[in-house]
Design a protein with these regions (language model features):
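Metal-dependent phosphohydrolase cores
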Residues: 1-179
């Protein structure tokens, strides 16, 4: 059994984790320190900040608190198994299985284990739409990338990871109480 250590001091095997292993503190900390796009951006922009932008777009569209929370947590598995860029991830079917198992634990932990197909499609849609805006803004050579209009203005400024982690926790705790 391979054990990982998390920021909060938890120790568990990520290949056999359960919802009790999930910690909001660990998610916020790790996601705020992981750079999007494999680090090939104009400056550091975290998975945590991306997740906050997705959640704020869901809120601006008037979507349910459950969908807003799902948007905030949609990349949370990356806190435990890091991020792999889409062009590579598409060739790693085993990664998808592991990611899915971990996401099930995370969604179960926060009461989202019963998301409907429509609710899941909404957070996936926003993930793609925000990604297009991020690519246009943060990657060299993508300035002319076509993007869909958003209801919000994503914050893609360079942010301190501690501020992102704190905001992630505040938003998550509020949504958990309200959903």
């Amino acid at each position: 059994m391979s054990v990982m250590n998390t920021f909060s001091g938890k120790k568990f095997d990520p290949m056999h984790m359960n919802s009790e292993d999930v910690s909001l503190e660990d998610l916020a900390h790790a996601l705020s320190l992981l750079c999007r796009g494999g680090g090939h951006l104009k400056y550091f922009y975290s998975v945590g900040q991306h997740s906050i932008n997705c959640m704020k777009e869901a809120r601006a569209r008037g979507w349910s608190k459950r969908v807003q929370l799902a948007c905030l947590l949609h990349d949370a598995s990356e806190a435990y198994i890091a991020d792999i860029i889409r062009p590579v991830k598409a060739h790693l079917p085993e990664y998808y299985k592991i990611e899915s198992k971990i996401m099930t634990c995370i969604f179960d932990k926060f009461g989202l284990g019963d998301l409907s197909e429509e609710e899941n499609s909404r957070w996936k849609q926003l993930d793609d739409e925000i990604l297009d805006h991020e690519l246009r803004e943060l990657m060299i050579g993508e300035k002319d990338r076509p993007v869909k209009s958003l209801a919000s203005v994503p914050d893609m400024t360079e942010r301190n990871w501690k501020d992102v982690a704190e905001k992630f926790i505040i938003l998550a705790e509020a949504l958990i109480k309200e959903k």
